[in-house]
Amino acid sequence: MRFDNQLMAPVALALLTALVVSFLMTPVVKSFAYKVGAIDVPKDERRMHHKPIPRLGGLAIFAGFMASILLFVDIRLNPQMQSILLGAVIIVVLGVVDDIMALPAKLKFVIQIVAALIPALNGVSIQALSNPNIFSPNAYWVLNWLSVPITVLWIVGITNAVNLIDGLDGLANGVSAISAATVLVIALICSEAQVAVVMAALVGACVGFLPYNLNPAKMFMGDTGATFLGFILSTMSIQGLFKFYAVISFAVPFLILGLPIFDTAFAMIRRMAHGQSPMHADRGHIHHRLIDMGLNQKQAVATLYVISGILGLSAVVLTTGGEAKAMLLLIALCVVAVVAARVVFPKEVKEELHEELEELTELGHHEEKDKQKEDSSHE
């Protein structure tokens, strides 16, 4: 594993600049949050804090990130980077308004799609996916007209997935920093200068805010920060990961963002199995499970940091090792995921899902019998 030494200086400066600006801006943003009433008041059992805490910390992260980008990334003749930053500004403005007055979910979703379309229509798009079937003669799936909708789905999905894991002090911020650091390492290995500097700025901005966000948190980053981090991670992963053609390239971004992706997927499946809306808020996320298993907030967050770090390290191995080693690693990770799911999803939940499926099956049988009776009566 070798890094491009010429990139180390700008990467280090970008990281340090974002860290300092983010750290210094947080008290300023905290004061602003109190003035505009952007305060998170615990109102239900999903909240893990017991006293009002100011939101809008994402503004400090955004300030640190932008300061570093404007200093170390030349965006003047770079329409792709311009489109990413424009979309990010829309996401941040949306987040600020939502943190202050709580916007309707449908409106937020529509605006997120608009923000995602900006980079998707300006070259930041998933053009092809590697075929996971290693026995197929076609190594890649060229998306053609599906490129834009799949790109928008990816960006909006990751944007919301990061927001959904923002349930414990420092969790989403730390996991995002680990994910960004992973992309940074891969970009350094592949000599992708722009991606490396942008990810360094994101890591620095996250780390600068982290002292205020770790348990017990003095400030939350709110939707402003969580959706911004998800947006940047999703768009930059397209720039730095999806465009590399390799048999296992489809797995790399999913590993790097594995924690928010799998937690969100399991949450939606669980809710639909219980007859609820996929967007219905509940206390079934992985961080809630760990708390219910007896861990305190710091232990739960540390556990998820380790999991995210292992996934990130696996992604680096996938990009640097041979294809045979990569496939073996993927198989091993799948086995670990199955075992972990049995631990994280306790017996009671499995029984609930089983009962729900039985009820649906019985309902189907009753409807079939009623239909048969109607048919016989007509005869």
List PLM regions with ranges.
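A helix-boundary/kink motif common to multi-pass secondary transporters
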Residues: 104, 166, 295-296, 323
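Long, low-complexity, intrinsically disordered cytosolic termini of multi-pass membrane proteins
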Residues: 297, 349-379
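Membrane-interface capping segments at transmembrane-helix boundaries
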Residues: 28-31, 340-355
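Extracellular/periplasmic helix-loop-helix junctions in multi-pass membrane proteins
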Residues: 313-331
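Generic hydrophobic alpha-helical scaffold/packing signal
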Residues: 208, 234, 256-259, 266, ...
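Cytosolic, membrane-interface loops and tails of multi-pass inner-membrane proteins
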Residues: 28-53, 266-298
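Alpha-helical transmembrane segments of integral membrane proteins
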Residues: 292-310, 316-319
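"…together with the soluble PPM/PP2C metallo-phosphatase catalytic core" -> "…together
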Residues: 1-262
